Regions:
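Catalytic-site neighborhoods of secreted/periplasmic enzymes
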Residues: 1-90
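Active-site regions of oxyanion-processing enzymes, predominantly non-cytosolic
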Residues: 33-45, 76-85, 89-144, 192-199, ...
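Polar, surface-exposed loop/tail segments
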Residues: 29, 93, 101, 196-198, ...
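C-terminal, low-complexity/hydrophilic appendages and adjacent surface loops
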Residues: 225, 296-399, 435
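A long, amphipathic alpha-helix that forms part
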Residues: 94-112, 151-200, 263
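Histidine-centered active-site microenvironments of extracellular/periplasmic hydrolases
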Residues: 129-144, 188-252, 288
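Short catalytic/ligand-binding loop motif for oxyanion handling, primarily in non-cytosolic enzymes
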Residues: 21-22, 28-33, 52-55, 116, ...
């Protein structure tokens, strides 16, 4: 969740006289662990029924009947809601993606002549399950003839070639649906002549492994570039002369906050580490040398745009690792009493505005290791360096002591910039004395 001390860009826009509206089917925002995000906007709309959304109230569903058409690997306790939800999603207009973009059209029809507004259209698709209307699925024929298989579990690939092709075809179908409805949004921009005074950003949160590196999904395995390198497309009327150009500067999602705040004429908080993208849009001016990313408890990763360095702790043990929060909720649940019983207060970080936080032991798996979102142990957890210029698929780690030392030093600098707790440096073996 957003912490009390977190800077929220829609909240800052709202407090400076702007208006923010979000349209989403992203049901995680309405669970424990996400419930402080959507209320930062002036108004919000949610479309129900995506994936495992707790949507329909059926006390005794006939799961034997409902699940009989699904691949056995797809029948898990947590997919129950999805199977129930699909019994109510029969026609294209029942899917959340068309509904979301329809609501976006409604917002634009009402507000296109107004000024100083932000519309966030957050579509859960093409997230799993890769369930799309039949007309999109027909565009990607394959030889698979089994039960419905459009939700691969986060695990190593051990499916047949036909099953793999089926999952990928379903992914292609749902992506095509998103593409078509995004195109309808662009048509609405044409219809309302919004290109003259309205900026548009297209991006996402993460990628997904569809068998690359012999994995499905995310979270458990290393953060390969298929997961970390995400699309970013920006239109702004001030830079329309540069339309269609590619940019090569290294950027991160954190750069969107200062960028959007700058466009609204709102001051950028001092805690912000992202950089405005205005100069990137204008002339592809570099705004950072490196970007740091990763999963809590796993590797700390860094890239300079060419090399990607994934540095794991020597031991994945959760000993000496802590979580810091004033909002003790996890993904879909509250912290348990057992998790909080030994909590202590930790001094403020440089981003908490002078406020202390609870210091809590992290989740552990049965082996005492920090766990991946309650999914178990991190896998393939060894440090590696890739040269993505010569090896864009990250198939073969390289040895280059000079590059590794440079990126380790930059990782240390970045962690200091973000005021990472001391135990992180020790855990990763990059204490200052290393240099």
């Amino acid at each position: 969740p957003l912490e009390p001390f977190d800077n929220s860009f829609p909240d800052l826009i709202k407090s400076n006289g702007g208006y923010g509206h979000i349209i989403t089917d992203h049901y995680h925002y309405f669970h424990d662990g996400g419930a402080t995000y959507h209320t930062r906007y002036n108004s919000w709309e949610i479309v129900r029924g995506a994936s495992t959304d707790d949507w329909k109230g059926i006390v005794e569903p006939n799961m034997e009947k409902i699940s009989k058409n699904y691949h056995k690997k797809q029948i898990r306790p947590f997919t129950k809601n999805d199977m129930i939800n699909r019994t109510y999603i029969n026609n294209e207009e029942d899917f959340s993606c068309p509904q979301i973009f329809g609501l976006a059209d409604d917002f634009l029809d009402v507000n296109s002549k107004a000024d100083n507004w932000l519309l966030q259209i957050e579509n859960f698709d093409p997230h799993e399950p890769f369930y799309a209307p039949t007309r999109f699925r027909k565009e990607y024929p394959c030889s698979y003839e089994g039960a419905v298989f459009d939700w691969p579990m986060y695990d190593r690939v051990d499916e047949t070639s036909e099953e793999i092709a089926e999952v990928r075809a379903n992914y292609a179908a749902i992506t095509s649906m998103c593409d078509e409805y995004f195109g309808k949004l662009l048509d609405k921009f044409d219809e309302l002549d919004l290109w003259e005074d309205t900026a548009l950003i297209l991006t996402t949160d993460h990628g997904f492994l569809l068998g690359e590196h012999e994995w499905w999904g995310k979270n458990l395995m290393p953060v390969y570039d298929e997961l970390a390198r995400i699309p970013l497309m920006i239109y702004h009327p001030d830079y329309n002369k540069n339309g269609g150009e590619m940019r090569h500067s290294l950027t991160q999602v954190t750069d969107l906050t200062p960028t959007v705040l700058e466009w609204f004429g709102v001051g950028i908080p001092s805690e912000t580490t992202g950089k405005s993208l205005s100069q990137v849009l204008e002339k592809d001016q570099k705004i950072r040398d490196t970007a740091i990313y990763g999963y809590f408890g796993a590797a700390c990763n860094i890239t300079d745009g060419r090399y990607t360095y994934l540095r794991y702790p020597k031991k994945l043990s959760a000993d000496g690792l802590y979580e810091y929060t004033l909002m003790p909720t996890r993904f879909g649940r509250r912290f348990s009493i057992e998790e909080l019983i030994d909590a202590t207060l930790s001094p403020p970080f440089n981003f908490t505005k002078g406020v202390p936080t609870l210091k809590v032991y992290p989740m552990k798996n049965k082996d005492g290791e920090a766990s991946a979102m309650e999914m178990g142990a991190f896998q393939d957890a060894f440090t590696r360096l890739y040269d993505t210029k010569s090896d864009p698929k990250q198939a073969s780690p390289i040895t280059n002591n000079e590059v590794e030392a440079r990126l380790c030093k930059e990782m240390h600098r970045q962690l200091l910039l973000h005021d990472a707790p001391n135990e992180i440096f020790k855990r990763l073996g990059i204490e200052e004395s290393t240099y």
